[in-house]
């Protein structure tokens, strides 16, 4: 999406679409607009060119500080399934970035924040209690989302330790 905020200036943003339904009416969800990492209008990485490098080598990716649209789920614009798809898509982007950096960094530190645990716990904690008022009329389909996530995050720690197979220091918080 191109925006023209002033003379001879264009700012580019990116969005993702999620098809909610086609009948009886077309319902299409659009994410909030992200800064295009291929042509960032503002610094979104350090060095500035790192965002462009990632976009060129891995494809465009989410750039908002809170990419997972918790408001859309809270306001029932999207359902839990759509939110999970969105959240895991963003997590997979970050994993690719992390392992790319880990692979290419011979000295120094590689730091990555995997905030999927925070997002999913905030949005799915209520599913642990079937009596929670927000669960009225719903099945227990999402009661294991948090547990499953932590199993997956444990596997991520294992893959990280394998990728850093030497005796380097690893810190997981």
Region annotations inferred by a language model:
Residues 1-137:
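His/Asp/Glu-rich, glycine-adjacent segments
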Residues 142-146:
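Extracellular loop and loop/strand-boundary signature of outer-membrane beta-barrel proteins
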Residues 148-173:
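Metal-dependent active-site segment of extracytoplasmic phospho-/sulfohydrolases and closely related
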């Amino acid at each position: 999406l191109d925006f023209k905020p002033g003379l001879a200036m264009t700012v580019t943003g990116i969005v993702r679409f999620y098809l909610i339904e086609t009948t009886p009416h077309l319902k299409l969800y659009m994410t909030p607009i992200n800064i295009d990492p291929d042509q960032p209008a503002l610094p979104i990485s350090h060095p500035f060119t790192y965002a462009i490098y990632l976009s060129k080598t891995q494809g465009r990716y989410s750039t908002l500080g809170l990419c997972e649209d918790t408001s859309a789920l809270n306001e029932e614009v999207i359902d839990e399934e759509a939110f999970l798809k969105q959240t895991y898509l963003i997590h997979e982007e970050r994993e690719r970035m992390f392992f790319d950096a880990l692979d290419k960094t011979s000295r120094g530190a590689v730091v990555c924040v995997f905030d999927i645990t925070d997002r999913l716990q905030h949005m799915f904690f209520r599913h642990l209690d079937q009596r929670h008022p927000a669960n009225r009329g719903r099945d227990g389909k999402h009661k294991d989302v948090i547990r499953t996530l932590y199993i997956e995050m444990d596997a991520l720690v294992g893959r990280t330790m394998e990728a850093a197979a030497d005796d380097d220091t690893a810190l997981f918080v």
